[in-house]
């Protein structure tokens, strides 16, 4: 699982999800990438599930890059707990994804297989996304 080794503060505020990504919007390492089209929190489990889906489809001969890291804790209070008495304990680690951000990159010789693998990964993520290549990017 992807979680930070050490954090300065155990709990954080929840940022507003607005604006578009300023960095990480191009495919830099591989030939194909998954680009987000909307705002979302993506958890460490969803990232891992998408990575496994890609690796199982391409088997061998390709390389996958994960360009996002869940560095923000989300808290939750226990069930049937009254309001008040402080903030809940950290439950998940998430990354705040903005539109235009490239989440995964893939290098693979066959374009059809690469697109099929990335499509499977998109189905594991809680956002609308599209497949971009190194040539066609916005």
Swiss-Prot record:
Give one Pfam family: Ribosomal_L16
- GO: which molecular function terms? rRNA binding; structural constituent of ribosome; tRNA binding
| UniProt-listed CDD domains | Ribosomal_L16_L10e
Q: Which UniProt keywords apply?
A: Ribonucleoprotein, Ribosomal protein, RNA-binding, rRNA-binding, tRNA-binding
Please give the GO cellular component terms listed in this UniProt entry: cytosolic large ribosomal subunit
Q: Which biological process, per GO, is one annotated for this protein?
A: translation
- Span list, region Disordered: 1-22
According to its UniProt entry, what is the function of this protein? Binds 23S rRNA and is also seen to make contacts with the A and possibly P site tRNAs.
Q: Which PANTHER family does the record cross-reference, listed alphabetically?
A: 50S/60S RIBOSOMAL PROTEIN L16 (PTHR12220), LARGE RIBOSOMAL SUBUNIT PROTEIN UL16M (PTHR12220:SF13)
- Can you name this protein? Large ribosomal subunit protein uL16
Q: Which organism is the protein's source?
A: Mycobacterium leprae (strain TN)
User: What's the encoding gene here?
Assistant: rplP
């Amino acid at each position: 699982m992807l979680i930070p080794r050490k954090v300065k503060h155990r709990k954080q505020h929840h940022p507003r999800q607005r604006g578009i990504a300023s960095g990480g919007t191009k495919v830099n390492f591989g030939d194909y990438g998954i680009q987000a089209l909307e705002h979302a929190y993506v958890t460490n489990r969803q990232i891992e599930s998408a990575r496994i889906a890609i690796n199982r489809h391409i088997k061998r001969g390709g390389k996958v890059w994960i360009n996002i890291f869940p560095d923000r804790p989300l808290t939750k209070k226990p069930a049937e707990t009254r309001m008040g008495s402080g903030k809940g304990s950290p439950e998940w680690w998430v990354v705040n994804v903005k539109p235009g951000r490239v989440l995964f990159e893939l290098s693979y010789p066959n374009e059809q297989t690469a697109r099929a693998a990335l499509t499977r990964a998109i189905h594991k993520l809680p956002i609308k996304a599209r497949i971009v290549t190194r040539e066609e990017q916005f």
